[in-house]
Amino acid sequence: MKAFPETFLWGGATAANQVEGAWQEDGKGISTSDLQPHGVMGKMEPRILGKENIKDVAIDFYHRYPEDIALFAEMGFTCLRISIAWARIFPQGDEVEPNEAGLAFYDRLFDEMAQAGIKPISANLRVEPSEECDASV
């Protein structure tokens, strides 16, 4: 049986809207993905956390990523494909400057991955434009 080459990337993938939670923290804008579980497109209404709002918290990767990255490293991951929440970087979709808190989160995440020996593979999440940006199209 042939062995995988040393350079083969073992890993997994996540989607920001499915794992991050923290939908309304550190300046993140409301994305179309935040609205979809509620069956309507439009302005976000205040909500009570419940099973129907599970994506609001998801696995709370935004706050618990160090623990998750450590588990991925323990599992032997050498890469992790993540998506970047557009509404966390450009909350309204038309800003000239990015949201520094959003950039800082991804900086910390990438640093944690590097320390664990996990190569980041990133993509913008295609279903994550800000609600304001999506509504203007």
Residue ranges and their predicted role:
Residues 67-137:
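Substrate-binding cleft and catalytic face of glycoside hydrolase catalytic domains
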Residues 6, 21, 25, 56, ...:
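Generic structural "secondary-structure junction" signal
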Residues 30-70:
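Aromatic- and Gly/Pro-rich amphipathic surface segment
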Residues 1-10, 15-16, 58:
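Mature N-terminal, pre-catalytic/accessory segment of carbohydrate-active enzymes
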Residues 14-39:
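Short, solvent-exposed beta-strand-terminating loops
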Residues 11, 64, 105:
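Charged catalytic carboxylate motif
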